[in-house]
Amino acid sequence: MLETYHFMKKYYYLLITIFLLASCEEDIKFNTPAFQSLKDNVFWRAQNYSAQAKAGGGVYISGGLGTNVVTLKLPSLETKTYVLGVDNLTAASYSDRFAIDKPEFTTGTNKGSGQVVITEFDNNKGTISGTFKFTAVNTNAEDLENPSVTFTEGVFYKIPYTPLVNFNN
């Protein structure tokens, strides 16, 4: 009887081990395309994103999560580092489109700071990739509760790019 017990115990442990190994699986999710960052040190990932040509040249790269939108405005598609807070040609903004007080945060000439780096622009596939970080100032100077918002470790990866459509043939 004792031998049968030890024999069954071995098979029991073997079955548990096989079950545990068989139930382990790797669920790999690819986040392509992606637009994400840390917003005031809290993970923020856009559910929708786009990159669109501006009429005067350059591009708007946007990511939205619900009613919140981050927009990066760049003067060109050249792969390089763009410094924020120097002029209004290169800017970053964050807004909540449907909030009651509609807070809006932006960088611009002597306002806010940061950088956007375009690491890749694939004209054939129509995608743009890069990184960003910025601190944007509240456009409402009277809002002392929220003077600024900070985005760090930002990444936009293979965002679909829409070139400017010219209807004049």
Name each region found by the language model.
Residues 35-39, 43-47, 52-127, 137-139:
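Surface-exposed helix/loop patches within compact recognition domains
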Residues 1-7:
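Short, Lys/Arg-enriched N-terminal segments with co-localized hydrophobic residues
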Residues 121-169:
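C-terminal or internal capping secondary-structure element at the end of a domain, subdomain, or sheet
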Residues 20-23:
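C-terminal motif of bacterial Sec signal peptides marking the signal peptidase cleavage site
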